[in-house]
């Protein structure tokens, strides 16, 4: 397991919110960040601080995407027609790692990235090991036959802490999902409030 995966709950602690809605999140037990200085009272954030926090929260939710990669996704959202914030969410939710996670084939976004990297996932019948692969509406995502009985997968499909969103059709009996459509921001079931408009403001400074 990578340092990034083992530190997944540190993202919750750093941000101060249970961004995935998981029962074991440390912020369910305390309201301060990690480290020896975590208990210090936070002052009021500046506009920049609020925007930065919104960006870090959104980046964190999708597996703590690197700044370089996240900025690249944002720049594509800007180039597309329509609202940049809506485009940003649509691009993030179209990633293969997000769809495997949303389909409840794995328990966490970090597990999704590792699962894809290890070659357990097919897209339209072909093995795909690129976690950032962008799916299109109509694409069929399937757990490979040799991987369907992995305990990680079987346990994830039984999780009650989240549901499969309606822009994905998941068949857990066949370990297969179809990406129905690119969602609007209002369709995406985040456990905490996300503010893509503030992310746009951050990069527009």
Swiss-Prot record:
Q: Where is this region: Disordered?
A: 20-44
Q: Does the keyword RNA-binding apply?
A: yes
GO BP terms: namely: ribosomal small subunit biogenesis; translation
Name of the protein described by the UniProt record: Small ribosomal subunit protein uS4
This chain's function reads:
One of the primary rRNA binding proteins, it binds directly to 16S rRNA where it nucleates assembly of the body of the 30S subunit.
> What are the GO MF terms of this UniProt record?
rRNA binding; structural constituent of ribosome
* Residue ranges of domain S4 RNA-binding in the record: 94-154
According to the UniProt record, one GO cellular component term is: small ribosomal subunit
Q: Name one Pfam family in it.
A: Ribosomal_S4
- InterPro entries xref list: Ribosomal_uS4, Ribosomal_uS4_bac-type, Ribosomal_uS4_CS, Ribosomal_uS4_N, S4_RNA-bd, S4_RNA-bd_sf
Q: Keyword annotations for this protein?
A: Ribonucleoprotein, Ribosomal protein, RNA-binding, rRNA-binding
| This protein's record includes keyword rRNA-binding | yes
Organism, as annotated: Bartonella bacilliformis (strain ATCC 35685 / KC583 / Herrer 020/F12,63)
Quaternary structure, per UniProt, is: Part of the 30S ribosomal subunit. Contacts protein S5. The interaction surface between S4 and S5 is involved in control of translational fidelity.
- Report the domain of life of the source organism: Bacteria
Family assignment from sequence similarity: Belongs to the universal ribosomal protein uS4 family.
